[in-house]
Swiss-Prot record:
Keywords: Membrane, Transmembrane, Transmembrane helix
Membrane among keywords: yes
Provenance organism: Arabidopsis thaliana (Mouse-ear cress)
UniProt name for this protein: Membralin-like protein At1g60995
Record field: transmembrane: 24-44, 315-335, 363-383, 392-412, 424-444
Residues covered by region (Disordered): 99-119, 506-567, 602-623
Length: 623
């Protein structure tokens, strides 16, 4: 079974299942999702990484009086439309005997008080929404406000005219004798819509209250590792801080809902604590993750010279390139080797099943050969685990790279896809890793989701715009050839053999220096005649391959170009040794993202060919 033939069948089946409308809908849907996630990432990064919005809520807590600080996000009343600050918005927090209670107001930064009944109540009052007044966003905010006002004026104009038309229709119906006095609140009450709204809000609040994250912050890691008995014995106190999810530091209503249900509070709390305290350790009780906040996010402004900044950014770029090349090369090598063995195993298993031969030995040998790649994949995973310091993020990056490499192996056949798809993949991959390494406490998962959405749109774009039309033209051309020659079957092996022969002939011609306008070497004439004869009257692909091997044996190899050999000798030999004997053609295709090594006259697998005028004498043309 030929791998190319299998890939063509897979693409043909997918192109039949996914109609052009479905493909276009998926393409634009992923583009919309990617742009939306990118806008959310920009807003979140500007408000909570560059300028942490909730840092002012934690600066008043003096850790000199308490060694530990427990932070709780209360989400009561988040889905209700009441903007009033009530006592229900901030639930009571009961602390231990040796703990302190922090009470936050607009005028006071923090106060500590100890009651006689060993219970403490904390009240959190919301601050005005002036905490988001940032001079850098004034222009953007003004433009957005002007756009919203213009839209509001147009919508109000349409609504006014619609209301006038409805009032006129109502008067006409009243004159006729059919009253249309509709009481909307009464109608909603009759239809039980008010109860539906009430139950919906109550259900959302009950689901939201389940997600109330609690954090424990300390300046020294040893305080966190002590058991409760040791904490009480050594008089280690805990300050309880409660912040409402409706607090203005979390933005407007839509930002609050988005943070509570999608983004999460981890990154916001980490950046706020780092901006206020500068260092320490943070523990999340829900996810049981322990964060080290001692790593500086950027150099201080006083010591951040241009040289240090340049060295830092160059290090980030080199690290991103290292991760890119290591991950893609290992995944590509593993994928190509495993798919070759899987196809070979499938053919052998079909042969054994048809002839009723024992299959235990075949399956056992295939399993043993496949176990060789298990340590490779485990090594890749452990390398990414240590590199990202986050197992889930590393696994998601590996899955994303695996998906793109699988698309490259199966579908990328046209010249424009071969030229531009690896470059866009490199661009998206580098942008994500530059953001990840530049901001240690950034929104990494949101950035990865944005990158994944853009890469999925990239895959659908190239497959829908270039690969599927080329596949359809290839299938039509093959069907027309089968109709003209019923006894002649075009397989992907024949196409690949002729493609490699044409490519080798073109490279031999370019490496030779002609002595005249009509100068041809005997070897070239021999190759041309053999290919013409095979293309004109080929009846068996095996016979064609035998003739091709004989011609190659009689052909004098072309003189190598010393410049190209010197440019690729050392580096390519090292890469070939690392990859275990990979072919130079695969290396050239891998390096094609930086330089275009394919000319327009070289052949491709998918061809846009028309039926030849004289099929008995003209060679089989493969573009």
């Amino acid at each position: 079974m030929d791998p190319e033939q299998t890939f063509i069948r897979v693409q043909e089946r997918f192109s039949q299942i996914l109609t052009p409308r479905i493909r276009g809908f998926l393409e634009y849907t992923y583009l919309f999702v990617a742009i939306t996630l990118f806008c959310i990432l920009v807003v979140m990064h500007a408000n909570y990484v560059q300028q942490p919005g909730c840092s002012s809520e934690l600066t008043g807590v003096e850790l000199a009086e308490a060694e530990l600080m427990q932070i709780k996000i209360t989400s009561a009343g988040l889905w209700s439309r009441n903007d009033e600050s009530t006592a229900a918005d901030v639930p009571r927090v009961v602390a231990a005997t040796d703990s302190l209670e922090v009470s936050k107001t607009d005028q006071e930064s923090s106060t500590s008080e100890e009651n006689t009944d060993d219970t403490f109540v904390k009240i959190d009052k919301e601050e005005p929404r002036s905490s988001f007044s940032v001079s850098a966003k004034e222009n953007v905010r003004a433009a957005i406000l002007r756009f919203l006002k213009k839209c509001y004026r147009r919508i109000s104009f349409v609504l006014q005219h619609t209301a006038r038309i409805l009032r006129g229709v109502r008067k006409i119906w009243n004159i006729i004798g059919i009253p249309l006095n509709l009481d909307v609140p009464k109608l909603l009450h009759v239809l039980y819509m008010d109860k539906v709204n009430y139950y919906a809000v109550q259900w959302l609040e009950s689901k939201t209250q389940e997600f109330e994250p609690t954090y424990l912050y300390t300046m020294e890691k040893g305080y966190f590792l002590l058991p409760d008995e040791a904490k009480s014995r050594h008089n280690i106190r805990t300050a309880n801080v409660s912040i409402s999810a409706r607090h203005p530091c979390f933005g407007n209503r839509w930002q609050q809902l988005l943070i509570n249900r999608v983004v999460g509070y981890d990154t916001i709390i980490m950046n706020s604590l780092q901006n206020s305290a500068g260092q320490g350790y943070l523990y999340n009780y829900q996810t049981r993750e322990f964060y080290n906040l001692s790593y500086s996010q950027e150099l201080p402004d006083g010591s951040a010279h241009f040289g240090d900044y340049l060295v830092t950014k160059c290090g980030v770029l080199m690290m991103s390139l290292f991760v890119f090349f290591t991950t893609t090369m290992s995944v590509s090598f593993t994928l190509r080797e495993t798919q070759t063995r899987m196809l070979k195993f499938t053919v052998q298993l079909q042969h054994h099943a048809q002839h009723r031969l024992p299959t235990f030995q075949l399956i056992f040998v295939h399993v043993i050969e496949s176990l060789v790649f298990v340590p490779i994949m485990i090594g890749i995973l452990f390398f990414l685990f240590e590199f990202y310091d986050d197992q889930l993020l590393a696994f998601m990056v590996l899955v994303l790279v695996w998906l793109c490499e699988l698309f490259t192996l199966i579908s990328v056949r046209t010249p424009i896809s071969m030229k531009f798809f690896p470059r866009f993949f490199l661009l998206y991959f580098l942008v994500f890793h530059i953001y990840f390494f530049s901001y240690a406490y950034g929104f990494s998962y949101l950035a990865l989701m944005t990158t994944a959405a853009f890469m999925q749109h990239l895959i659908l774009y190239f497959w829908n715009r270039f690969e599927v039309p080329a596949l359809q033209r290839f299938l039509q051309s093959r069907q027309s050839h089968l109709q003209q020659h019923p006894d002649f079957h075009i397989t992907s092996s024949t196409i690949l053999a002729s493609t490699l022969h044409i490519t080798r002939l073109n490279r031999t011609t370019r490496n030779r220096t002609p002595s005249g306008p009509n100068h041809t070497t005997p070897n070239q004439n021999t190759e041309t005649r053999s290919f013409t004869a095979d293309g004109g009257g080929v009846g068996n692909p095996a016979q064609y391959q035998e003739q091709q091997e004989e011609n190659e044996a009689n052909t004098v190899p072309a003189e190598p170009n010393p410049q190209q050999a010197g440019a690729m000798s050392s580096f390519s030999s090292m890469l070939l040794w690392i990859l275990g004997g990979a072919s130079s053609e695969g290396l050239n295709s891998f390096l094609s993202m930086f330089r275009d090594v394919r000319d327009e006259d070289e052949a491709q697998v998918f061809a846009d060919t028309s039926p030849p005028q004289n099929p008995h004498h003209d060679p089989l043309s493969v573009d």
